[in-house]
Amino acid sequence: MSESSQSMAPRTRADEAQSKSFVLPLWAINIIRLILHALSRLFWRVSYKGLENIPQTGGVIIASNHQTYIDPIWMSLPFRREIRYLAWSESFGWPIIGKIIRWLGAWPIQIKKADRTAIRRSRQWLKNGGAIVIFPEGGRCLEDGKLLKFEAGAARMALEANTPILPITIRGGHRVWPKGYRLPHLAKVELIFHPLQHVTMREGEDARTSARRETDQLAETIASEL
């Protein structure tokens, strides 16, 4: 056989997701958003506050607490622009959900180790004026809906790309799809869009200290409406 050792290397979920990536055009995504918005109001009485805080242009990190698998969909519905999502690479292999998140613009990220490719790609997207969703908890919240400790990656990326953060509080989502259940339940859900958080590096701070301070502020803002 003449195959090189590189071609024989096993492919990860992230590799497969990258090679099969196909994002729907914005007009199609907006139609899907309208349909999903109607379904979300019907089944979960999803409501929104603070929509005036949404920037429809310019680079922005959209950061939220993470209560259920449906969070990224609910978060995106008020937008009329392209959004990218950092999603667990393994989720691209799930039936139905894997295809949907790929069509809607999700990018794979390996959560068990530093994924420099995903981080570099996201940072460039932001610098080009794009919007990207990041869940600072790194996973779903506690069963009672309370926050996990926030990782500093979102704030660090915002500092590097010189972009603001749009904090979002999702309230009630943990009752829709509790951990251990295979299907969602009916429950009221509310999303609060807070004013933009403009990250800064203060005099005398290094990048790590600034990112941690901004992360703590982000967590405090999101927790204020839980």
Question: What do these predicted regions represent?
Answer:
Residues 51, 65, 88, 137, ...:
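Generic beta-structure capping elements
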Residues 41, 54-113, 121:
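Catalytic core of membrane glycerolipid acyltransferases/transacylases, capturing the structured
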Residues 48, 85, 106-108, 165-167, ...:
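Conserved beta-strand scaffold positions in the cores of enzyme catalytic domains, especially
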Residues 3-56, 95-104:
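A transmembrane-helix-recognition feature enriched in membrane-embedded lipid enzymes
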Residues 43-45, 82, 103, 129, ...:
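A generic structural signal for alpha->beta connector loops
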Residues 1-28, 117-226:
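Non-catalytic C-terminal accessory region of glycerolipid acyltransferases
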Residues 52, 114, 171:
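Residue-level "edge-of-site" marker
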Residues 27, 31, 35, 71-74, ...:
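Hydrophobic alpha-helical segments typical of transmembrane helices
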